[in-house]
Amino acid sequence: MIPILGELFAILAAFCYAFGSVAATKNARENGGRGNAVLLSIVLTAGFSGGLWLMVGPSLPPLDADVWVGVAIFVVAGILATVLGRIFFFRSIELAGAIETGLIRRLIPVFAAVLAIFFLGETLTAASALAFALVFAAVALVVVMARGGAAAEDADAVRASRERNAGRILAMLSAASYGGSYVTRKLAMRWLPDPLLGAFIGAVAAFACFAAAAPFSPEYRRQLAAVLRRPTCWQLVSAASISLGQTAQFVALRFTTVTAVAIIGTIEMFLAAWLAAWVLRTEARPGPDFAVGSILAMAGVIVLALARA
């Protein structure tokens, strides 16, 4: 087995999440706001992970008490990430943009690392601590430089400041939900060590939550009905990217620590910025400070990979 298999899947997940966030922003701007990307991505996650499990996954173990404990914890993880985290995520990038949402959501490793220490007994190794320092130095650099140019940027902002503030709050809630989901997924695999089945269970649980809430929410009814309609190109790209990212993240958690996956996930911010600026052209091009931050963040990922190699 490849020594850094978990880290490689974590990098793939970060790229997929970054591309999905930028695609969602592009769809929001081209098609007048929010679409059905949240529920569509849940359906795609269930189909993708379930199909892979049937083709290459292990056989279903005997349905004893341990298996049901694992299933229950996977359900909680699905609600945290696929329902709460993803709803907050999609709406925040529509209100605040891919770059700012990605910046605020860098709190995910903080939530994940603290919870992993308490619930999983993980410890910060020297390599993890160095990687953590490099990545957060990168984030701090970008935050400081962004504050310096905030007034000029806000004067020309297309979105109202109230919407941007709402997007920032939702990004914070998304970070807390995703941080908790990392830990619950890893915890569930102590009883049911099958990442593909875990991704499928989480997606099905999330879909059930939407279906149960639909009679009480016109918005959820609209989203359920929208799944039956043909999605826009960018809705499909965004949902598929996020679904692939979530499945890859499950696999990463099977082979490495929560802390490592969370730290590597931080590079999503930098990947999203470069994709938004140079590939899909939905945001302004990052400046030299962002380039330096990107190098620091990648250095942190390299430190983690070398420590595991």
Per-range role (PLM):
Residues 162-190, 196:
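Selected transmembrane alpha-helices and immediately adjacent juxtamembrane segments
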Residues 1-76, 86-96, 144-172, 204-243, ...:
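Membrane-interface interhelical linkers
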Residues 44-48, 104-119, 133, 205-209, ...:
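Alpha-helical transmembrane segments of compact multi-pass small-molecule transporters, enriched
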Residues 18, 50, 78-83, 109-114, ...:
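Hydrophobic/small/kink-forming positions within alpha-helical transmembrane segments
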Residues 105, 116-152, 281-303:
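Loop-to-transmembrane alpha-helix entry segments
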Residues 41-42, 105, 128-132, 175, ...:
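Residue-level recognition of transmembrane alpha-helices
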Residues 36-38, 101, 197-198, 261, ...:
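Juxtamembrane helix-start motifs in multi-pass secondary transporters
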Residues 32-34, 97, 120, 124, ...:
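A helix-boundary/kink motif common to multi-pass secondary transporters
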